[in-house]
Design a protein with these regions (language model features):
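Short alpha-helical segments enriched in small residues
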Residues: 2-183
């Protein structure tokens, strides 16, 4: 299971390269086509997901905003993550990622909330959580989903892979899997 999760972000990049588009371009097209809006709550990615979503012209049609909730206090105050969940599970957990995605969706009144939390390294300040452990979550009117990833590489590589995986999750939610049937 962990082996397939490690390669998740590579999968999206490979599939989209086959059709000649980057993840950012494909996600932008799908968001515009659907008329849906998105907001992002980021911890370990520090704004990378928001940056990628706004890299395309016309991103104001679908990107409402984001919060970099690097500190636990911001997760609680701005996103409504229960302090008890952070205390019990640490900020790097499925439940925190889910609460972040649901919180940003609710706060910014968007169709989709996307989040990422994890340990980028080079050391872990949340033992016993290993470096590379990442949770991404997506909240929509249809419900909330999450993925646990075990990423490898340098701090920068882990952050980039986490951002790519989050965009991949958004791509799948928006119907990106239909692209697979055209290949």
């Amino acid at each position: 299971m962990a082996e397939s999760e490690v390669k998740l972000e590579d999968f999206f990049t490979r599939v989209l390269s086959i059709i000649g588009k980057t993840t950012e371009v494909e996600v932008a097209e799908l968001l515009k086509k659907s008329g849906k809006t998105v907001a992002v709550a980021e911890s370990l990615t520090g704004g990378l997901i928001s940056s990628k979503l706004t890299s395309q012209p016309g991103s104001t049609e679908y990107f409402i905003g984001g919060i970099v909730s690097y500190h636990n206090r911001i997760k609680v105050m701005e996103l409504g993550v229960p302090a008890s969940v952070i205390a019990k599970e640490s900020p790097v957990s499925k439940d925190v990622a889910v609460a972040m995605a649901e919180g940003i969706k609710r706060r910014y009144r968007t169709d989709i909330g996307l989040s990422a939390t994890g340990v980028a390294g080079p050391t872990s300040t949340t033992p016993p959580k290993p470096i590379g452990l990442t949770y991404i979550a997506l909240a929509s009117n249809e419900g909330t989903s999450f993925k646990e990833l075990h990423l490898t590489g340098t701090r920068g590589e882990i952050r980039e892979k986490a951002a790519a995986a989050a965009l991949g999750l958004l791509w799948l939610h928006l119907g990106g899997e239909e692209v697979l049937h055209k290949i």
